[in-house]
């Protein structure tokens, strides 16, 4: 019996993307509503607090804002917080949904003064829709075509001032003209275990799941620096604690639940180990090209780049080089394998 790798990757308990519509609904219930409730991303939060306060005092729309970074770090949450802090409405859509210029025009013409338009996956906007967006962002105007053939004519419509908040995991795929029209650009970073501990503690309170600090930290340190994963693991650990114990989440209870879920102490699951083992044992530590690596583990190259690699690189287990991916000494140590004295390129580890 064959296993579809796409289905398998979607079922990962430590996947940074929402697993279902039900999970998205739970996420909405757990989201902070205001900046002072938002944990982590201190630099971005401080900047937004100043920019939002200034825009509110001037009674102007906030500058167009681009939020980028790996999935699950809070881009959608920040978009909702921006709208709430500005005291305006939020209209939400995504790049793939806006197939025709008319789809975007309908959204823009229904915005009220200073409203927030949130476009997720903005890097996937079609070129036709993107062209319509440029004058809307700069001049709050759009040009639409009325009629067809020789009788067709262009009509310019004035829009209310608004704020576009774009979110993307692939900032490099944005066109330069679109990127240049954002006045505020913020990169979201992975969270520290202490920040995630605060998030887990807050979420457990909202879920009425008793948890101690050690239990929260045990979940946090295995959450790959990602709040979405932390909240998902918390819900699974809560289930385990209610069935196997009295419902209280302690360090021992959290550890037992996470072992059952096959999430190891650094947050790796079978897919992470599969990737690192391929680099270490199939390709002798690398360098290995992305296409070869994708074929070796049966995953799409986009999944490797967007989902698997960011955390492995950030934690120092994997390194990107011009010649391909290579395993670091940290990866060798994690699997209990002696690292070679020289790197895969024949250079000493740690050398220039």
From Swiss-Prot:
Instruction: Provide the residue positions that the database annotates as binding ATP.
Output: 30-31, 72, 75-77, 138-140, 181, 191, 228
CDD domains per record: AAA (cd00009)
Q: Which GO terms describe its molecular function?
A: ATP binding; ATP hydrolysis activity; four-way junction DNA binding; four-way junction helicase activity
Binding locations of Mg(2+): 76
Q: Name one Pfam family in it.
A: RuvB_N
Gene Ontology cellular component? cytoplasm; Holliday junction resolvase complex
The EC number(s) attached to this protein equal 3.6.4.-
* UniProt-annotated location(s): Cytoplasm
Q: Where are the stretches annotated Head domain (RuvB-H)? A: 265-352
Keywords for this protein: ATP-binding, Cytoplasm, DNA damage, DNA recombination, DNA repair, DNA-binding, Hydrolase, Nucleotide-binding
Q: Where is this region: Small ATPAse domain (RuvB-S)?
A: 192-262
Q: What PANTHER family does the annotation carry?
A: HOLLIDAY JUNCTION BRANCH MIGRATION COMPLEX SUBUNIT RUVB (PTHR42848:SF1), PTHR42848
User: Which HAMAP family does the entry link to?
Assistant: DNA_HJ_migration_RuvB (MF_00016)
What's this protein's family per the entry? Belongs to the RuvB family.
Q: What does this protein do?
A: The RuvA-RuvB-RuvC complex processes Holliday junction (HJ) DNA during genetic recombination and DNA repair, while the RuvA-RuvB complex plays an important role in the rescue of blocked DNA replication forks via replication fork reversal (RFR). RuvA specifically binds to HJ cruciform DNA, conferring on it an open structure. The RuvB hexamer acts as an ATP-dependent pump, pulling dsDNA into and through the RuvAB complex. RuvB forms 2 homohexamers on either side of HJ DNA bound by 1 or 2 RuvA tetramers; 4 subunits per hexamer contact DNA at a time.
**Subunit annotation:** Homohexamer. Forms an RuvA(8)-RuvB(12)-Holliday junction (HJ) complex. HJ DNA is sandwiched between 2 RuvA tetramers; dsDNA enters through RuvA and exits via RuvB. An RuvB hexamer assembles on each DNA strand where it exits the tetramer. Each RuvB hexamer is contacted by two RuvA subunits (via domain III) on 2 adjacent RuvB subunits; this complex drives branch migration. In the full resolvosome a probable DNA-RuvA(4)-RuvB(12)-RuvC(2) complex forms which resolves the HJ.
Could you give the domain comment from the record?
A: Has 3 domains, the large (RuvB-L) and small ATPase (RuvB-S) domains and the C-terminal head (RuvB-H) domain. The head domain binds DNA, while the ATPase domains jointly bind ATP, ADP or are empty depending on the state of the subunit in the translocation cycle. During a single DNA translocation step the structure of each domain remains the same, but their relative positions change.
Protein name, as recorded: Holliday junction branch migration complex subunit RuvB
Tell me what organism the protein belongs to.
Answer: Herminiimonas arsenicoxydans
Q: Which gene encodes it?
A: ruvB
């Amino acid at each position: 019996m064959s296993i579809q790798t796409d289905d398998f990757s979607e079922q990962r308990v430590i996947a940074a993307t929402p697993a279902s519509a039900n999970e998205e609904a739970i996420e909405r219930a757990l989201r902070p509503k205001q900046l002072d409730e938002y944990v982590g991303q201190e630099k971005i939060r401080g900047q937004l607090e100043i920019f939002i306060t200034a825009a509110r005092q001037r009674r102007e729309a906030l500058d167009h804002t681009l939020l980028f970074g790996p999935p699950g770090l809070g881009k959608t949450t920040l978009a909702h917080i921006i709208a709430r802090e500005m005291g305006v409405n939020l209209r939400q859509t995504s790049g793939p949904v806006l197939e025709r210029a008319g789809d975007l025009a309908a959204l823009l013409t229904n915005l009220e003064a200073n409203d927030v338009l949130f476009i997720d996956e903005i890097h996937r906007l079609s070129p036709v829709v993107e062209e319509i967006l440029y004058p809307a962002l700069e001049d709050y105007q759009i040009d639409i075509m009325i009629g067809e053939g020789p009788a067709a004519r262009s009509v310019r419509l004035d829009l209310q001032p608004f704020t576009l908040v774009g979110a993307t995991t692939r900032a490099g795929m944005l066109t330069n003209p679109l990127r240049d029209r954002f006045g505020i650009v913020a990169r979201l970073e992975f969270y520290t275990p202490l920040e995630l501990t605060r998030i887990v503690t807050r979420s457990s309170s909202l879920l009425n799941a008793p948890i101690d600090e050690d239990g929260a930290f045990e979940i946090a340190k295995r959450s790959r620096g990602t709040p979405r994963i932390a909240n998902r693991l918390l819900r699974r650990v809560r289930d385990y604690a209610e069935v196997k114990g009295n419902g209280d989440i302690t360090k021992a209870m959290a550890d037992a639940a996470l072992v059952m879920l096959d999430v190891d102490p650094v947050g790796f699951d079978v897919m992470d180990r599969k990737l690192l083992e391929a680099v270490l044992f199939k390709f002798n530590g690398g360098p290995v090209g992305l296409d070869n690596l994708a074929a070796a583990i049966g995953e799409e190259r986009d999944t490797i780049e967007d989902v698997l690699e960011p955390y492995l690189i950030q934690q120092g287990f994997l390194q990107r080089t011009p010649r391909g991916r290579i395993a670091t000494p940290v990866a060798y140590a994690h699997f209990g394998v002696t690292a070679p004295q020289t790197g895969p390129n024949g250079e000493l580890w740690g050398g220039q």
